[in-house]
Every structure is written in structure tokens, then in C-alpha cells.
């Protein structure tokens, strides 16, 4: 009888130690900024060669936010990010001159970073990442 009580107490003590708030807080600290980003809906950007529209490239973009940013408020601004990207892509296409199936990612990142900082305010944007690019058609660059 005493053995049962002692073993039940030992099991209860072991379970209570693993479910403490301190252990849960350690797990949260390991993850860091979980969910501190805004994923943009896919955007079709034009590819222009010799003044003619030859293709579209669908781009998936993620805007990474700082830990001080209000994520829910900035996720509501996702249409503004897409609008800025589409306007910039039509003003001066981001296509790579060597490959008509790719976008010049560094130029897109620089442009969207600048526009996103204007949309959100200073100190809210950590980085912009192009997750993937999918061309509508596979094309080869025209001979020079």
C-alpha cells in the first residue's frame, strides 16, 4: 500500500515538473520571432524584351518584420505591399536581360524594401525575401 502511494507521488511530481511555466517559457525563447512576417499573395510581374511584353513571372514574396512590429496590423496592409510591387514592376520591369523566365531578385528586394518602409513606417521591416519565381512560359533570351 505504501509503495503504491510513494510511486504515485513520484509520478505526479515528475509530471508537474515537466509542465511548469518555466519550461514552457524556455521553449518560447528558443523559437524567437515566430510568425513575424507578411506573405504576399503571388504577383504576376511582366517580362519585357525590346519594348514588347513576352512573358509573366509569378513571384512569391515574404516581408520579414522586426520583433517590435505589430504583425496583425501589418498583415492588413498586405494589399498595399502587392500594389507597390505591381506598380514598380510595371513602371520599370524587373526582368533579367539574360533570362526571360526570371526576375532580377536583388533589384526587386531593394525596391520593395524601400516601398515597404514607406508603407509601414520606420523600424518595422527587417528584410524582404523572394521565396520563389515561376514563369508563365519557358523562354530563351533572344540573340544579341
Language model features with spans:
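Flexible, low-complexity charged segments
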Residues: 1-144
